[in-house]
Amino acid sequence: MRAATIGMALLATAGAAHGAECVDAKAAKTGFVLEMPGIRSEFRPAAGGMVSVANTYQSESPQTQFLYAGLIEVFRDSTTGHLAMIPLGDLKKLFPLKAGAKSTTQFVELSPNKQPKGTKTLELAVKGKETFSLGGCKYNVLAVKETFKNQAGETLDTFTALYAPDLGASLARRYDEGTSSESVVGYETIKPLAQ
C-alpha cells in the first residue's frame, strides 16, 4: 500500500512539474496519445478491462487493437487483415501484476477464412520495476518479459515490455536483453487525448 502511495505521489509530482502534457492515472481514464516517429497511438479504456488502441502509421494503413489491461493483445483489425487471440484461461487472474509474478496462458489464434493450427502460449515474467521517461514525464513501469511459443514449444517471439500499470499501456519494448544487440523501441511523447 505504501509503495502504491509513493508511486502515485511521484506521478502527481511529474504531472505538476511538467504541466498538462504529462498524463497521470486519473487522466488516463479519459484516454491519451503516445507517439514516436512515424507512429501515433490513441489509447482509450474500454469495457471488461480492455484498452482500445488506434494506431496511425506514416507508411502503413491504420490499425485498431484491443489489449487486455493494455498489455495482452486479444484482437487486431486493419485493412490488411483481422486477428483474434482467444485466451483459454482467465486473464483477470493475472492482474494486477507484481514483481516476481510468472504466468502461462494458452491462446487460440483466429482469423477470417483460416482454421486454427493449434494453440499458442504466452509466458509472462515480471522481472522488476523501473522508471521510463516520455519527453519530460517519468513513469513507474514493470519490466514484463513476454515469450510467445507455438504448440510445439518453439519460441516465436520474445521481448520485455516496459508496462505502466497506471496508464494501462506498454511504453516501450526491449529486445535481445542482456546481449550486445540489446535495443529499446519505445514511444517518445505522451499527451491527453483531445476530447
PLM feature segments, named:
Residues M1-I6:
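Bacterial N-terminal signal peptides that target proteins for export
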Residues T13-A16:
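N-terminal signal peptide c-region/cleavage motif recognized by signal peptidases
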Residues A20-R76, F107-Q195:
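Acidic, serine/threonine-rich low-complexity disordered tracts
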Residues S78-L124:
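Extracellular-facing segments of soluble proteins and assemblies that are Gly/Ser/Thr-biased and enriched
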